[in-house]
Amino acid sequence: AQIVKDTVEQALDGVLFIDEAYMLWDGHWTDFGQEALATLTKCMEDYRDRLTVIFAGYQEETEWLINSNAGLKSRIKYKFQFEDYTGAELARIYVKMVNDDGYLCNTDALLAIDKLMDQAIKLHDPKLGNGRFVRNAFEITLNRMAARIAGSDCHDLSTIMLTDIPRLEELTGKK
């Protein structure tokens, strides 16, 4: 309970953002999850004029959490659902990561990224995690690029090639 209280005190007059909040309750209460939620619910009441709490996470799991505690549910005034990114938006995020890290993609790699992100969206799998999926793809790309460069006399150390781009199966285990 003290950790929750300390965290709330740090967030007073601001926002407490709880990512993957549903992990406090996975259908069964853990001692920590139940105590944390009870403490947080009380703090939300005690500091209602000084604290905004955002519970973020997958919609269904977050609804379970909120519905598991009537006191919590009654203190949540607004609910927002954000749509998943499109394949084109995911591809733009990927390219931004590439550029921010000082790399370039050749044309074939860019086309492969567009295709990969479109394929991922078509899976309709909310567990892909949007930005997390892109980050995972980018990290695999960099690992593959490093392996390609290490095994050759390549002098271009900043261009991502088609062979560096992971396939969907590598990222999801699905075909």
Q: Model regions: which residues?
A:
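Hydrophobic "anchor" residues on beta-strands that sit immediately upstream
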Residues: 15
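Conserved AAA+ ATPase small/helical "lid" subdomain
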Residues: 80, 84-86, 94-156
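Short glycine-rich substrate-engagement loop in P-loop NTPases that contacts/grips substrate
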Residues: 1-12
